[in-house]
Swiss-Prot record:
EC number: 2.7.8.-
Lineage of source species: Bacteria, Bacillati, Bacillota, Bacilli, Bacillales
GO biological process: cardiolipin biosynthetic process
Cystine bridges: none
Catalytic activity: 2 a 1,2-diacyl-sn-glycero-3-phospho-(1'-sn-glycerol) = a cardiolipin + glycerol
Topology relative to the membrane: Multi-pass membrane protein
Family per record: Belongs to the phospholipase D family. Cardiolipin synthase subfamily.
UniProt xrefs under InterPro entries: Cardiolipin_synth_Firmi, Cardiolipin_synthase, CLS_N, PLD-like_dom, PLipase_D/transphosphatidylase
Name of the protein: Cardiolipin synthase
Length: 502
C-alpha cells in the first residue's frame, strides 16, 4: 500500500458520487452516509489484513471497526496507520545506525571484560547488536529517588554548564518547575551557553506559546518533535517522543521517568505523592545519550552537530561501578529493542525478577515469559499503582493479574501516591531504568531510552528502593481478587481487548 490515505479518499469520493447521483431522494442522507462509512470501513479492514500485523492487533482493529464503524474509522485515521512506519523512519534508521557505528565502534572487548555470569553475557551481546550501543566500564551513575532529589540535582548541574545544554522531553509544563527551568536556561543562554530543547508536540500540547517564545527570544533553540497540524491526516501522531534526556557539556547526563511539571513533586491534588526514579550519569556512557539527542535533533531540524565539539573522543574516564549501557528504542528501529531486552532480562533470570511499572500492559511474549519464570520457582514481583492515571490502561492492566497470580507472580498495589517508576531488576544484579513502560506503546510506537546497569552500585540502590516501596504497597490475593464485581470484570475485558491499541 503505497498510499492508503489516497485510496481511502478515492473511496469516499466514489461514495459521495453515488450519493449525489442517487435518484431516490427519500432517505438520501442516511443512505449516503451508510455508503460512505461502509466503503471506508471495508477498505480499511482489507488494508489492515494485508499489513500482516500481529494477530491480536489485527483482530482488535477489526472488532473496533465492526462494532463502532464511524468512531473506528476516525480512530484508525489518527492512530492505526502504522503501515507507513518503515517508510517514515527508514532514512532516520539508516543514518542512526551509520552514526552509531562511526562514533561508537564495535567494542566487543568491553563485553568480554564484564565480570558477569556466562548466562548473562548473551544479554549484553543482544543489547549491543540491536541497540547499537557499547557497554561502558568507565561511567558513574547515581539513582535519584522522586522529584525533589531529581529536580534539585538537575538544576544544580544546569547551573554549572559552560558550553552546551541539550534537553529532550515528552511533557513540559509552564508551572513552578517549568518556570524554574526556563529561568536557568535563559540565564545560561545569555551567558553564551548553547541551549537546545526538543519537546514532544503532543505530550507538551498545553505548553504556552509565551513560555516557548521567551526561551527563543533569549537564544534557546526550542523545537517541537513531530508537530501535528491535521490529526486525522497526520502520519506521525501515533509515534511520540517519550524520552526524557538531559546532556550537559557532553559529560553529565540524566534519564528516567520524570517529565517537567509540578505533579512530579507531588503537588497534584488527585495523585498526591509521586513515586518516580531518575538516573544521574557521568562519564563515557553520556556519549551515547548525546548521540541519541543529536540524531533526534538532526531528524527534526536537518542540522548536524556530529562534530568533535559535541562528541569529543577525549572524554574523562571515571572509575566504573560495573557496566552501563544506554539504549534507544522506537518506531525507527528494525527490532523492538526495548521489548526484546526486557524479554532477554526475564529469561536470563536465575533467582528473581522485580518490576515496577505505572502502565503494565504486556504483550503475549512478555506475559508468557513472566508466567513461566514464576512457575519455574523464581521470585517474580510486580509493583503497580493502586490509583489509576489513565483508566482504560489501568483496567487493561488488571485484566492480566489473575493469570499471573495463578502462575505464582506476586503483585503489589502501591498506595502511598502514584507509582510512575519504570524499573526492572533481575537477580539483584542487572537492572533497567528509563522512560519505557511495560506496555505495547513503549514496545512498538514510542521513542524511548533506557539505561541498562550491570553489577553497579546503582542496582543495589534500586533493590533497596524497591523493598522500601513494598512497605507502602499491599499484596493482591488471588482468591479475593477473583471476587471483584462482574461489572469490573467486563470493563477490564473490554480494556484488554483494546490493549494492542494502547
Amino acid at each position: 500500500m503505497r498510499n492508503t490515505l489516497r485510496v481511502i479518499i478515492f473511496v469516499l469520493a466514489v461514495a459521495a458520487f453515488l450519493f449525489l447521483t442517487n435518484d431516490y431522494w427519500e432517505g438520501k442522507l442516511l443512505g449516503g452516509l451508510s455508503i460512505l462509512i461502509s466503503c471506508s470501513v471495508v477498505f480499511i479492514a482489507f488494508v489492515i489484513s494485508l499489513e500482516n500485523r500481529k494477530p491480536a492487533h489485527t483482530i482488535t482493529w477489526l472488532v473496533v471497526l465492526g462494532s463502532f464503524p464511524l468512531i473506528g474509522f476516525f480512530f484508525y485515521l489518527m492512530f492505526g496507520r502504522n503501515y507507513r512506519k518503515q517508510r517514515l523512519f527508514q532514512k532516520k534508521a539508516m543514518l542512526d545506525e551509520q552514526t552509531f557505528l562511526k562514533f561508537q565502534g564495535q567494542r566487543e572487548w568491553a563485553i568480554e571484560q564484564m565480570p558477569i555470569g556466562e548466562h548473562q553475557r548473551p544479554l549484553l551481546q543482544l543489547a549491543h547488536r540491536i541497540g547499537k550501543s557499547p557497554v561502558s566500564l568507565a561511567t558513574e551513575t547515581r539513582v535519584l529517588t522522586n522529584g525533589e532529589e531529581t529536580f534539585s540535582t538537575i538544576f544544580e548541574e544546569l547551573e554549572k554548564a559552560t558550553h552546551h545544554i541539550h534537553l529532550e522531553y515528552y511533557i513540559v509544563r509552564h508551572d513552578e518547575v517549568g518556570q524554574k527551568l526556563k529561568t536557568i536556561l535563559i540565564e545560561k543562554a545569555k551567558k553564551g551557553v548553547h541551549v537546545r530543547f526538543l519537546y514532544d508536540a503532543v505530550g507538551s500540547w498545553k505548553l504556552s506559546k509565551t513560555y516557548i517564545q521567551e526561551l527563543r527570544d533569549a537564544g534557546v533553540e526550542m523545537i517541537p518533535f513531530s508537530p501535528v497540524r491535521l490529526p486525522f491526516l497526520s502520519n506521525t501522531i501515533n509515534f511520540r517522543n517519550h524520552r526524557k534526556i538531559i546532556v550537559i557539556d557532553g559529560t553529565i547526563g540524566f534519564v528516567g521517568g520524570l517529565n517537567i511539571g509540578d505533579e512530579y513533586l507531588g503537588k497534584d491534588k488527585y495523585f498526591g505523592f509521586w513515586r518516580d526514579t531518575h538516573l544521574w550519569i557521568r562519564g563515557e556512557a553520556v556519549r551515547t545519550l548525546q548521540l541519541i539527542f543529536l540524531q533526534d535533533w538532526y531528524y527534526m531540524t536537518g542540522k548536524t552537530l556530529l562534530t568533535p565539539e559535541y562528541l569529543s573522543p577525549e572524554l574523562v574516564h571515571y572509575d566504573g561501578q560495573g557496566g552501563v549501557q544506554l539504549i534507544a528504542g522506537g518506531p525507527d528501529q528494525k527490532w523492538e529493542v526495548i521489548k526484546h531486552l526486557y524479554f532477554a532480562m526475564i529469561t536470563s533470570a536465575q533467582r528473581s525478577i522485580w518490576i515496577a511499572s505505572p502502565y503494565f500492559v504486556p504483550d503475549e511474549d512478555i506475559l508468557t515469559a513472566l508466567k513461566i519464570a514464576a512457575l519455574s520457582g523464581l521470585d517474580v514481583r510486580i509493583l503497580a499503582p493502586k490509583r489509576p492515571d489513565k483508566k482504560i490502561v489501568f483496567y487493561a492492566s488488571r485484566s492480566y493479574f489473575p493469570e499471573l497470580l495463578e502462575a505464582g507472580v506476586k503483585i503489589y498495589e502501591y498506595s502511598k501516591g502514584f507509582l510512575h517508576s519504570k524499573i526492572m531488576i533481575v537477580d539483584g544484579e542487572l537492572a533497567s531504568i528509563g522512560t519505557a513502560n511495560m506496555d505495547m506503546r513503549s514496545f512498538h510506537l514510542n521513542f524511548e531510552v533506557n539505561a541498562f546497569l550491570y553489577h553497579t552500585d546503582s542496582t543495589k540502590k534500586l533493590v533497596a528502593d524497591f523493598l522500601e516501596d513494598l512497605k507502602e504497597a499491599s499484596p493482591i490475593d488471588y482468591e479475593t481478587f477473583q471476587q471483584r464485581p462482574l461489572s469490573i470484570r467486563v470493563v477490564e475485558s473490554v480494556s484488554r481487548l483494546l490493549s494492542p491499541l494502547l
